[in-house]
Amino acid sequence: MSERRIIHVDMDYFFAQVEMRDNPKLKGKPVIVGGKASGRGVVSTASYEARQYGVHSAMPTAQAHKLCPNGYYVTPRFEAYKTASEKIMNIFKSYTEVVEPLSLDEAYLDITHLVRPDLPASRIAQYIRRDIYEATMLTSSAGVSYNKFLAKLASGMNKPNGLTVIDYRNVHDILMGLDIGDFPGVGKASKQKMHQEAIYTGQDLYNQSERDLIRLFGKRGHGLYNKARGIDHNPVKPTRIRKSVGTERTFATDMNDDEEILQKIWELSNKTAERLAKLQKSGKTVTVKIKTFKFESLSKQRSLRDPVRSETDIYNIAYDLYTELKNPETPIRLVGVTVGNLEKATYENMTIYDYI
């Protein structure tokens, strides 16, 4: 069996780039696409110029205004992004049927069957990026490797408009020198916990035994052990069907303050709504999950007559569910919000602002 060749393609600051393409006056400017600061809107995408001010996705737009008061704030145009995405996905499928979309602007492609001695995977990735630019006038970054984890890692290494290959010749050096926070799937809480264990780099992670990582991180420990070694056997799944969309947050310290927890639930509702929008889905169930300081998992779910998609609707239901779940005497270490029973969303007379 030939060695797998996987490409991960990720569009560069997708929503902001579409806006800059359609309005050349925005080129080179700090462009922030997102909800309005007057409400509780959040940033969906920030151009690289805006990121230099500390603006990033999922940040409250009001906070972005403080960091970048002279930025160009743009109300999202979902149909424009959807049109560009359809062209991009069609290009992927013109190369291979084994395409796993992750969102409107990101996908895995298994091109193992296309690779020949005179046609390496890196050249195929170059062709794909060229075709995307010619069809949309948008740049993309791609990572090429022998598994999904490394391909995704590679795609983020030379952004924007970059191409990176990770193979057996350079994988060890790349992983060993990687900051632990740059490993896909390692969030702020996990990073802080790793720092407490003197794990700062890929080398430090590599030096941990699998048993110790499982003791520290539960089931995730096995995956972290493999990631430090560049191991990922997961296939590219072209018929991937999502049954739910959700977001969880593990706190750096156990939390018992309702106001802080509800703020986190609002942020999770925003993130979940944004992911629903990218997947063009809405859902008829909302679930809130908490994990106590004793690692006890509790959850509440509500089934709905009409599907929900906006962050406000999701939050209002999540608020009620959390109120039913909470015990004032019990600190919690994790909270999650999930929308399930998904169906195709209807977008008539709507913009992506409904989801941000």
Curated annotation (Swiss-Prot):
Its cofactor is Mg(2+). It is found in: Cytoplasm. InterPro entries: DNA/RNA_pol_sf, DNA_pol_Y-fam_lit_finger_sf, DNA_pol_Y-fam_little_finger, DNA_polymerase-Y, DNApol_IV, IMS_HHH_1, Rev_trsase/Diguanyl_cyclase, UmuC. It comes from the Bacteria. Transmembrane segments: none annotated. It is an enzyme of class 2 (transferase). GO terms for biological process: DNA-templated DNA replication; error-prone translesion synthesis; SOS response. It catalyses: DNA(n) + a 2'-deoxyribonucleoside 5'-triphosphate = DNA(n+1) + diphosphate. Residues 6-187 form the UmuC domain. Its EC number is 2.7.7.7. One of its GO terms (molecular function) is magnesium ion binding. Keywords: Cytoplasm, DNA damage, DNA repair, DNA replication, DNA-binding, DNA-directed DNA polymerase, Magnesium, Metal-binding, Mutator protein, Nucleotidyltransferase, Transferase. GO terms for cellular component: cytosol. Mg(2+) binds at D10, D105. The record marks F15 as: Substrate discrimination. CDD domains: PolY_Pol_IV_kappa (cd03586). Belongs to the DNA polymerase type-Y family. Poorly processive, error-prone DNA polymerase involved in untargeted mutagenesis. Copies undamaged DNA at stalled replication forks, which arise in vivo from mismatched or misaligned primer ends. These misaligned primers can be extended by PolIV. Exhibits no 3'-5' exonuclease (proofreading) activity. May be involved in translesional synthesis, in conjunction with the beta clamp from PolIII. Monomer. This is DNA polymerase IV. It comes from Staphylococcus saprophyticus subsp. saprophyticus (strain ATCC 15305 / DSM 20229 / NCIMB 8711 / NCTC 7292 / S-41).
